[in-house]
Amino acid sequence: LTDASIGYYVDLVPQGLDATQTQALLGFLAYDRATWEAYRKMDGDLSAVEASTTGEELESYRENYRKSQAAGEREVGTARMVVSSVEMQSGSEAVVDACADQTQIKRVSSNGEEIPKPSWQHKYSYLATVRLVDGAWKVASLQETRRLIQRASRLQLLRRSEHL
């Protein structure tokens, strides 16, 4: 699942999934990896994204990709993913509860200069609806559930001060 050659790491997936849940999970991870790789390469090839995404989510991705492409931007760094659950809604739909860590991703211009920290560069949790479409599990929608506070050291200091 992890591919260090492209800086894509899957740190945790749930254990004990049945065959259908596993296929839905693999469909979700195919989407996540494809979108990361497309933003890294920025070569216009969205075939892997199109194979793992459907509906409004695919259109939304294409629009955001075109904006980045027109601006001459691409991404470098490391993407990390944790999946906490895969809940079947029916035989052809699942909801994947995931957490993405994008804090080690940088957006760079065509000449390699870092673009100031984008607003999306954070850790966040979201629910992905994955549907079985023409024999393949594809991401149909993403719903961000919460952003995780990036001030871990500050929180640790606060906790330490509470114990003094």
Q: Can you annotate each of these PLM segments?
A:
Residues 1, 5-9, 88, 158:
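Extended hydrophobic/Leu-rich segments
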Residues 70-111:
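Surface-exposed, charged secondary-structure patches
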Residues 45, 49-52, 70, 79-82, ...:
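Short, surface-exposed, charged/polar-biased interaction segments
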Residues 3-75:
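Core segments of small alpha/beta cavity-forming domains
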Residues 94-136, 145-164:
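Exposed beta-sheet edge and beta->alpha loop/turn motif
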